[in-house]
Amino acid sequence: MKQYDIEKDIRYLQLLSQSFPTIAEASTEIINLKAILNLPKGTEHFLADIHGEYEAFLHVLKNASGNIKRKVNELFGTTLREQEKRDLCSLIYYPEQKLELVKNNEKDIDDWYHITLHRLVAVCRDVSSKYTRSKVRKSLPCDFSYIIQELLHEHTEDHDKTAYVNVIVDTIISTGRADDFIIAIANVIQRLAIDQLHILGDIYDRGPGAHIILDKMRRYHSWDIQWGNHDVLWMGAAAGNDACICNVIRLSLRYANLSTLEEGYGINLIPLATFAMETYNDDPCTEFLPKLSGGAASLDDKTTRLTAQMHKAIAVIQFKIEGQLIEKHPEWKMDGRRLFEHINYGKGTVEIDGKEYEMSSCNFPTIDPKYPNRLSEEETILIQKLHHSFKVCEKLHKHIRVMLQHGCMYAIFNNNLLFHASCPLNADGSLKEVEIYPGHKYSGRNLMHYTGMQIRTAFQQDSDPAEKEYAIDYFLYLWCGPDSPLFDKSKMATFERYFVADKETHKEEKGYYFLLRDNEEVIDHIMDEFGVTGPNRHIINGHVPVRTLKGENPIKANGKLMVIDGGFSKAYHNETGIAGYTLVYHSRGFQLVQHEPFTSTEDAIKLGTDIKSTTQIVEMSNRRMLVADTDIGKDLYKQVEDLKELLYAYRHGYIKEKETKKM
């Protein structure tokens, strides 16, 4: 028998004995934990770069990246017609809306209820089969918890049990509870189909519904996020960084997607519109015409013109404020980005990296060439109003708190290292030191950790005022700084893309991480630094769209690195050739699911259309992975060992059992 140092652990064991006051209860818990360790591991889903495309994202959650459709095919492949299977899937994804359609068209609704309830129970039984009854029970709505448990655990091979199940189903229908039951069990199926959701950054920008996505995530059962550069930009805006506020508004105007700003967060853009119309009334603002896609494609000429004027107005203010912040922080080494100071306003040229370029336009009525980064009086008043709107927006701050609660710069789950973009490297593949606070340089894991701490400093009430001010300023560096782990490029060529036709200036040199990440040794070195161990370890990233049309492969470094930005954003569909990836990690291994564009929620409900997805097997295990093989399994093993030590303490008289009252 194993010997324990009871005296050393006695205080902890006494606390543990309060939860398990008898030998019998401690033994029962050991049995339960051992049983859980031998269940198949739960299914993890990895998504990245959602960029406000809420309809496609929510549909992927509802269909579990095609997993529910696959299970319906396995269960009813030869017994149901294709349309019936599509309708069943559609009912699981959108129960409330689908029920309305069915009730308008179905002649014998009670018969439909009876058949459908049995089918839904069969699907629910299948998706819940890898979980303990306790975990399933916790996922059930209170109203139907007992009934669903009875239906899931009664097998209809027995004639008496069949009658029992039929009576339950008939009673659900006869009491008028069929609709509520269908909605409840459909939501349970959705919930159990995804055990853990990992979002590798960039919920915000480009698409119209980041606020809708975050409303969903506030209520989602189990998820985490590794912040992306666009998420951090919105965090900076919420914290009061005026450069971030300008960038957020500029990007929304660039894609003519103001839904998140105006409808989601109630940000008042009327002062900006008024200022832009007055200031740029005679300016065609050609370079600032919005990129139109999706719902924004139908903008009329008048709205498009106003959007371009607002776009230019906020861009000019942004470049001025960025210039001020860069001057305030010479340690960022970004002086070359103070480009308003390098314009020859008489000639209409700009000097970039020592070379003079002609500008496509040079109409800047609010710029004083002597003090080009100084805001005009009207611009100052405008930015104060916008700053106030962001600072007092309760819903925005609620969403940022959700991202802080569930998020971090990096995470390690089951031997997989997750981060959005980059781990800065030197040319030789060694980890690069980056200064994130004057005099404080970090690399690798420490860089990610302390960057995350810096972000949190900006939102903590008890932060040192000087540190908090720096943390708020630093959001701009995280967005576009050359050594930022969320950017890692030589520059962000926003100014050049607007004002310089020569495309040589648009080039953004990628950092060494992006150049070396196909090298297996480099990837192994990074994983070693982060303490990621095991024979099947990986890095998973988003950030850089995988251009499948050009033959790019999301699997790199001999399978050790996976890049899963497949272009959820409609703006990138033509570049990537697809509409996003989901990486699925289940008990049999990794599968990469490639999605085609989603038509609409309305089509999914009315026509039963689904996202067409193709699955690529990335890595299959030679045996089924169990809970014992996961991070949760390691914790459960520790709990088992602690309970064994408690049993030893009971049996050797170190701790006395306590009598428990019998119910």
What name fits each language-model region?
Residues 1-663:
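Feature recognizes metal-dependent phosphohydrolase scaffolds
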